[in-house]
């Protein structure tokens, strides 16, 4: 046999990836060839930088420093242990309450697939908890009728935003016989919304509620074309509407194969099969954060109300017998097929609208196909939801009179100003960007926690009182002197700010806690700190008459206030001609241009490393044992700001200061612009 005439021969070992990971994990557990040490809360984890860099984009960036020790302060040792298991075994075991921490860690470390899995699991858990809560409410039967109406209409009102994104499920000329498959299964279901047409879900729910008001109970929808979930038989007073709307999160039952077959009717079988393989759509960031928050809140509030789960095969009193749900939630992804109807003609009987006091504009038959595409997409939905919104707001004001409530997640806040600040979290507007890697975050706290990953470095010595890190032991001993004697300093563990007195730290902590105990004598507005109140008082003196309604800062002229407010509103009028990136302030755009030109006008005097902007240079100086940007040329003491250096120089005697001394000589950096 002539081997030279044979083509290329391919040899493949299908078990190689699994065996490679398994061997790497064994070496990690044995401490063999580990070349990096990750410290989390004084606990060391030995690992291989290649494995971590392949798993996490953030580790890949950090490991370019060729350091052996890194410190992570934004997660717990338990969470990082789970991250390690995931990196070395491609699996991890976690409880439901750990998903929130895993999601946050995966986002910062940029482990994309783990982040997606946590998002989907949080959505699934939230949907399951919503069904459990509704069933508990049906068993108790002690809830007020007005509260129940407000809750359902609130869900309808919340779906307004999702409806504008999903669009019509059925438009003119596409009224197919039989069920249709909605094309937007990624619409958030964290509030009990289905993947069906949002308008139909709203009208069906409203009609059911109206019938309950007229007849005293909710009747299940009649007709052979309305599919219901397996495991029905819930109390018809509350659970029926929820059951119908949550079909998108349920796996089709083996007892009802017709439901699965109907999902591929109408000539759309291939698309449905592909979507079934992909699993449910990835939810939006705002919905999953809300889901995680509601997951914790809901368990705390209903801990005393939820009865213990029934054993398998035993049905609770008053319900048909059906298998009990699994006791724990696992990191599995459901492959579900949305199979809801979306009829073209939606009608609302006048009897229902009269019972609910709905305006006459809703008590008509609405045939979308008659408009022939003349109206803008989403116009009818917006008009309908504006009416439902007025009704929901009216009912909410009657049932809740204490404080203000977020219309998205339902959390109660002390005043309207706090609600407006809170709503920014739901908008998903990430206005805080990292200057080192470009990643953006919802608030400054998450950005500061992310920056710790950049500034970790090789710092093995940690202060046990404030958490400050140093690369040399003598630097740590020098730092510890600040915690002793009359000059003892205290630090905020949340933001790292330093204070000379415990009372000042306590006042500062009230800002993090959201306590507002300082009241303006002129306008009775409340503020979280004395400093914020003093800043606000400038608006009454006339020196700084222009006040920011978001944070209370005052300015001398309107143009400065306008520039400042862009930080809160997210407006970015300055756009880069090269890459299209937008900025709130003009000087930010000018600094950004240096990315394209390669200009680095700031130079470190200690190691001659150059940076594009001042803030990056300040961050770099901290890598030199935490050096502040200004150093006295007489006593070599460091100062954190130019004003503090000026105050420090006043403490020196005039004869100690050289005749050619200038303040610029205290700078630890050079600026060539």
Swiss-Prot record:
InterPro entries: BTB/POZ_dom (IPR000210), SKP1/BTB/POZ_sf (IPR011333), Znf_C2H2_sf (IPR036236), Znf_C2H2_type (IPR013087)
Phosphothreonine, modified sites: 282
Pathway: Protein modification; protein ubiquitination
Gene Ontology biological process terms in this record: anterior/posterior pattern specification; apoptotic process; cartilage development; cell population proliferation; central nervous system development; embryonic digit morphogenesis; embryonic hindlimb morphogenesis; embryonic pattern specification
Compositional bias per record (Basic and acidic residues), positions renumbered to this chain: 293-302, 319-331
Domain BTB stretches: 34-96
Induction entry: By retinoic acid.
CC per GO annotation: cytosol; male germ cell nucleus; nuclear body; nuclear speck; nucleus; PML body; protein-containing complex; transcription repressor complex
Principal location: nucleus
Region (Disordered) location: 215-236, 249-332
Sorted UniProt keywords: Chromosomal rearrangement, Disease variant, DNA-binding, Intellectual disability, Metal-binding, Nucleus, Phosphoprotein, Proto-oncogene, Repeat, Repressor, Transcription, Transcription regulation, Ubl conjugation pathway, Zinc, Zinc-finger
GO molecular function per UniProt: DNA binding; DNA-binding transcription activator activity, RNA polymerase II-specific; DNA-binding transcription repressor activity, RNA polymerase II-specific; identical protein binding; protein domain specific binding; protein homodimerization activity; RNA polymerase II cis-regulatory region sequence-specific DNA binding; transcription corepressor binding
Phosphoserine, modified sites: 76, 184, 197, 256, 628
Superkingdom per UniProt: Eukaryota
Compartment(s) where it occurs, according to its Swiss-Prot or TrEMBL record: Nucleus; Nucleus, Nuclear body
Entry comment describing in which tissues the protein is expressed: Within the hematopoietic system, PLZF is expressed in bone marrow, early myeloid cell lines and peripheral blood mononuclear cells. Also expressed in the ovary, and at lower levels, in the kidney and lung.
Marked site positions, Breakpoint for translocation to form PLZF-RAR-alpha oncogene: 394-395
Family statement: Belongs to the krueppel C2H2-type zinc-finger protein family.
Function per UniProt: Acts as a transcriptional repressor. Transcriptional repression may be mediated through recruitment of histone deacetylases to target promoters. May play a role in myeloid maturation and in the development and/or maintenance of other differentiated tissues. Probable substrate-recognition component of an E3 ubiquitin-protein ligase complex which mediates the ubiquitination and subsequent proteasomal degradation of target proteins.
UniProt disease annotation: Skeletal defects, genital hypoplasia, and impaired intellectual development: A disorder characterized by intellectual disability, craniofacial dysmorphism, microcephaly and short stature. Additional features include absence of the thumbs, hypoplasia of the radii and ulnae, additional vertebrae and ribs, retarded bone age and genital hypoplasia.
Subunit-level organization: Binds EPN1. Interacts with ZBTB32 and CUL3. Interacts with ATP7B. Interacts with transcriptional corepressor RUNX1T1 (via its N-terminus); the interaction increases the transcription repression activity of ZBTB16. Interacts (via C2H2-type zinc finger domains 1 and 2) with RNF112.
Protein name: Zinc finger and BTB domain-containing protein 16
Organism: Homo sapiens
The encoding gene: ZBTB16
């Amino acid at each position: 046999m002539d081997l030279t005439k044979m083509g290329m021969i391919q040899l493949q070992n299908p078990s190689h990836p699994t065996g490679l990971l398994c061997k790497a994990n064994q070496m990690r557990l044995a401490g063999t060839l580990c070349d990096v040490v990750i410290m989390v809360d004084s606990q060391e984890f030995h690992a291989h930088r290649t494995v971590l860099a392949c798993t996490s984009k953030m580790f890949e960036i950090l490991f370019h420093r060729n350091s052996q020790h890194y410190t992570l302060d934004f997660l717990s040792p338990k969470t990082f242990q789970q991250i390690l298991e995931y990196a070395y075994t491609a699996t991890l075991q976690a409880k439901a309450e750990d998903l929130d921490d895993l999601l946050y860690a995966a986002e910062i470390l940029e482990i994309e697939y783990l982040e997606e899995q946590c998002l989907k699991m949080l959505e699934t858990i939230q949907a399951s908890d919503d069904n459990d809560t509704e069933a508990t409410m049906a068993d108790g039967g002690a809830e007020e009728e007005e509260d129940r109406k407000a809750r359902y209409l609130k869900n309808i009102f919340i779906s307004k935003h999702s409806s504008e994104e999903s669009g019509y499920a059925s438009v003119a000329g596409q009224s197919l016989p039989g069920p249709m498959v909605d094309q937007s299964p990624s619409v958030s279901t964290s509030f009990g919304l289905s993947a069906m047409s949002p308008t139909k879900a709203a009208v069906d729910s409203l009609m059911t509620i109206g019938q309950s008001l007229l007849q005293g109970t909710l009747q299940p929808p009649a007709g052979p074309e309305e599919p219901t979930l397996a495991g029905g038989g819930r109390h018809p007073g509350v659970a029926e509407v929820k059951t119908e709307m949550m079909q998108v999160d349920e796996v089709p039952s083996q007892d009802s194969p017709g439901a699965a077959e109907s999902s591929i009717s109408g000539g759309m079988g291939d698309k449905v099969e592909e979507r079934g393989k992909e699993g449910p759509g990835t939810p939006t960031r705002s919905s999953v954060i809300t889901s995680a928050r509601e997951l914790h809140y809901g368990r705390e509030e209903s801990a005393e109300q939820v009865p213990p789960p029934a054993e398998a095969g035993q049905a609770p009193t008053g319900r048909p017998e059906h298998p009990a749900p699994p006791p724990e939630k696992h990191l599995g992804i459901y492959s579900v097929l949305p199979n809801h109807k979306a009829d073209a003609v939606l009608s609302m009987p006048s009897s229902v609208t009269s019972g609910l006091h709905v305006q006459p504009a809703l008590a008509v038959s609405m045939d979308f196909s008659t408009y022939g595409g003349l109206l803008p997409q989403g116009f009818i939905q917006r008009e309908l939801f504006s009416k439902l919104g007025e009704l929901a707001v009216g009912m909410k004001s009657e049932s809740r009179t204490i404080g203000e409530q977020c219309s998205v997640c339902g959390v109660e806040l002390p005043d309207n100003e706090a609600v407006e600040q809170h709503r920014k979290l739901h908008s998903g507007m990430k206005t805080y960007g990292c200057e080192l890697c470009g990643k953006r975050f919802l608030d400054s706290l998450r950005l500061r926690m992310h920056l710790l990953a950049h500034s970790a470095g090789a710092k093995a010595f940690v202060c046990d009182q404030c958490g400050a890190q140093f690369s040399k032991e003598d630097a740590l001993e020098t730092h510890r002197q600040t915690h002793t004697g009359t000059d003892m300093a205290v630090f905020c563990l949340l933001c790292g700010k330093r204070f000379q007195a415990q009372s000042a730290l306590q006042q500062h902590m009230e800002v993090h806690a959201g306590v507002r105990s300082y009241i303006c004598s002129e306008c009775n507005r409340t503020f979280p700190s004395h400093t914020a109140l003093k800043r606000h008082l400038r608006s009454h003196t006339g020196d700084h008459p222009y006040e920011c309604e978001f944070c209370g800062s005052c300015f001398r002229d309107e143009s400065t206030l306008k520039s400042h407010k862009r930080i809160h509103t997210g407006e970015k009028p300055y756009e880069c001609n090269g890459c299209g990136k937008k900025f709130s302030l003009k000087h930010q755009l000018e600094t950004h241009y240096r990315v394209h030109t390669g200009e680095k006008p700031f130079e470190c005097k200690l190691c001659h490393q150059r940076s594009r902007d001042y803030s990056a240079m300040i961050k770099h100086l901290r890598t030199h044992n935490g050096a502040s940007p200004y150093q006295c040329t007489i006593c070599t003491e460091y100062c954190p700001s130019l004003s503090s250096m000026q105050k420090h120089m006043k403490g020196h005697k005039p004869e100690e200061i050289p005749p050619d001394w200038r303040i610029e000589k205290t700078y630890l950096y050079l600026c060539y612009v």
